Amino acid sequence: MTRKQRRLLMIGGAGVVLIVAVGLVLNALRDSIVFFSTPKMVAEQHIEAGKRFRLGGVVEPGSLQRGEQLRVSFKVTDGAASLPVAYKGILPDLFREGQGVIAEGSLDKAGVFEADTVLAKHDEKYMPKEVADALKKDGHWKDDYGKKSPGETTAGQTSANAAEGGK
């Protein structure tokens, strides 16, 4: 084998190893690329029981039920589908019906999302585009979603501190 053939063989082998490594990394990160799944996505993907993922949407009004020993249940909706959630623990201060939420956990065999972490979103202006589009499509969109709060000018400024030069 000549030097040129040996060099080409080494380059080809390194290329194959690199392609396999990139493929393995992308396969491992496939489920982590999406920050969360909406209830409609969960229904369409038929996620098996026990697989961990994040569920995002809006807490369905009228669905919150508080039980004993910090147990709560509620439904998360994206306007197109809803999914029951069970959680045991202290809910965030900003958690309320009609508010954005992200829960982390897994589905049980009955199709209930067993959350071990619940994060409340600050307000509707941070609502995911997919959820906002689904709410608009189904006629559940409120006109005050995404509007600035009274006295708010730009992110992090109120009209009072904007007049002082943003201090």
Curated annotation (Swiss-Prot):
TM regions (residue ranges): 8-28
GO terms, biological process: cytochrome complex assembly
Compositional bias ranges of the Basic and acidic residues kind: 137-150
Cellular compartment(s): Cell inner membrane
Residues holding heme: H122, Y126
Region described as Disordered: 137-167
Entry keyword Transport: no
Coiled coil: none
Chain's role: Heme chaperone required for the biogenesis of c-type cytochromes. Transiently binds heme delivered by CcmC and transfers the heme to apo-cytochromes in a process facilitated by CcmF and CcmH.
Protein name in the entry: Cytochrome c-type biogenesis protein CcmE
